[in-house]
Amino acid sequence: MIPLLFILFYFTNCIEWHKFETSEEIISTYLIDDVLYTGVNGAVYTFSNNELNKTGLTNNNNYITTSIKVEDTLVCGTNNGNPKCWKIDGSEDPKYRGRGYAPYQNSKVTIISHNECVLSDINISKEGIKRWRRFDGPCGYDLYTADNVIPKDGVRGAFVDKDGTYDKVYILFTDTIDTKRIVKIPYIAQMCLNDEGGPSSLSSHRWSTFLKVELECDIDGRSYRQIIHSKAIKTDNDTILYVFFDSPYSKSALCTYSMNAIKHSFSTSKLGGYTKQLPSPAPGICLPAGKVVPHTTFDIIEQYNELDDIIKPLSQPIFEGPSGVKWFDIKEKENEHREYRIYFIKENTIYSFDTKSKQTRSAQVDARLFSVMVTSKPLFIADIGIGVGIPRMKKILKM
């Protein structure tokens, strides 16, 4: 299939819009090697070097939920209930991947690739329980979480970070506890990327190092507990985790966490509800290649996978914003080490927050915004096309 080049663009409010031929329902956006991939029904748009291209795939209820780089860059979609992947030029994926790379029906997904190891929260069967899964590849064979470990609405962030000599996978999600009243609890969970699975034939494809710990984001008696989106940014000696939370208070908040502190908690905290002496190796410890956790360690982590700890943010929320925020991204300011401009979007409004001046500004656009991605300039992905540039914004005195 031949990609089509779109050259129609116009400026509005200092944003250069590269327009789609028709208004699109945006399904997914991914930034891979400074190329923006935007999935729609039956096609994927690519945007780089100020050029917008479209590759048609099929129009048979094929919602493109995934763009991912494994050996090649793949785009994957629902394909009318038969998930399938293609190369970016529209040709067939020679490995015929699809299940677990795209859902059976259009839904929000989380999928990442690290050194060609692929991990996702996408069901591999139509009626399957939501799980966090590692696919067969360079990091080992298929692994998945136990029943009901991952909430039905899935994961809201995933990344790999090094802890000592081991690579570890981190995922973020919000659990809902429904007892006398509904309580939402935000978590970050940790697993060893090269986990060898459980010690028996029944557990050999289960994560054997899964642990989780609660995140706190509170200000003035308001507790933010619904994770919307997250982003990890490496610094010289740490990785800073930015997490956007929603709440019932008509407000949202952005909190930051030190991954060094989170890793320390995973390695030193007690397990909630477990009172006996821990075996060796302790639950959650990464083992050398070829080593499998013993039964005693695995049995404990199956029953007690939550730390008796709560991770505090580095400070109070960086800022509070409106509820209903869909997405955010961060740009380090030129010549300002560790000073950032944070862009976030809601409906047809773009917001920016300056971490140095503590000022929030906003601008409205005549488009339905889906996401924002930051390269050398912010990219605003909307139903009408891709917007490039910093809009002319008005200062907000109070959110």
Swiss-Prot record:
Pfam families per the UniProt record, alphabetical: Sema (PF01403)
Membrane-spanning parts: none
A Gene Ontology molecular function term of the record: semaphorin receptor binding
Biological process (GO), any one: integrin-mediated signaling pathway
Record keyword Signal present: yes
SUPFAM superfamilies, A to Z: Sema domain (SSF101912)
GO cellular component: extracellular region; plasma membrane
KW Phosphoprotein (keyword) present: no
Keywords: Secreted, Signal
Source taxon at top rank: Viruses
PROSITE patterns named among the record's database cross-references: SEMA
SMART domains noted in UniProt: Sema
Location(s) in or outside the cell: Secreted
Span of the signal peptide: 1-14
Gene3D superfamilies in the record: YVTN repeat-like/Quinoprotein amine dehydrogenase
Task performed by this protein: Acts as a semaphorin-like protein and binds to host plexin C1 receptor. May alter the movement of plexin C1-expressing cells including dendritic cells, monocytes, or granulocytes in the proximity of infected cells. May also regulate host cell cytoskeleton of neighboring cells to improve viral infection.
Family: Belongs to the semaphorin family.
Quaternary structure annotation from Swiss-Prot or TrEMBL: Interacts with host VESPR.
Protein name in the entry: Semaphorin-like protein 139
Organism (species): Ectromelia virus (strain Moscow)
Origin organism lineage: Viruses, Varidnaviria, Bamfordvirae, Nucleocytoviricota, Pokkesviricetes
